[in-house]
Amino acid sequence: DRDGNISWTLAGRIPARSGHYDAQIPADWTQPDTGWHDWLDPGHYPVLHNPASQRLWSANSRTVSGDQLTLLGNGGFDLGARATQIRDSLLAREQFTVDNLQAIQLDYRAPLLTRWHQLLQTTLETADDAASWIPVMKTALAGWNEQAAADSVAYRIVRAYRYEVMKTVLSGFAAAVRQHHENFELPRLSQTESILWQLIEHQPQHLLPAAYKTWDELLYRCAQTIAAQLQQDGGITERNWGMQNAARIKHPLSQKLPGWISQWLDMPHDPLPGDHNMPRVQSPNFGASQRSVVAPGQEE
């Protein structure tokens, strides 16, 4: 406000829950002390007011903890990688210009993937295999600069490796459920990063997916899988991030019209820097709803 105070809270209604039941588990609301009984009084809303850091950030991640988090519940908040980068950039300065704040919004560094890059390098170095794709992938990984740049081959490889390992490990957990419910699908799980790393670092044999003898084999086979995918259409070193992350912004009518007309209605397929899990959120058909910098008293 005009006095320099800053605050964060929620807009809209929050349900007032009955009793102390766990809202993340299906429950029978006909039972006492279960379900919602009204709307929460705004006076009980979570509020962050003038934090010691003199900074506020959210980026769709968890903003509160403890009793306040219990009050809100888990609505599927983001991993927090994007919020961490924004926080660190805000704490790096005491004074900001418009350009400084815009640079934070356009930041496409990928520190989340740094240890995935290291893991993939280690996996390739220790592999007892003379496969031809290994030296090619090593060469491509040498260009790693921790950025989701459109021309980065290394970023595309490391990103694909992370998702392949994640898919493989989580599918192992789902397999046990599918033995009893064959159509079971895992929900969207945005907080799996720390769980994955605990498994990778401790390598518990009883949690290893049945198709693999060791965790090292799993990590190697995941690298082998993405190598096979990226070797198509020109080879690994030709498959940069911009080829995958190219704009796909279509006119509402173009999908129902012949291709020669659609090309005049759709936006160009420009290669895009950025990705999920970083401030510059940008994918072929999704991105930040808006990017703006406003100084109080200088709204124009």
Descriptions of predicted regions:
Residues 1-133, 139, 143-300:
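C-terminal/peripheral segments of proteins
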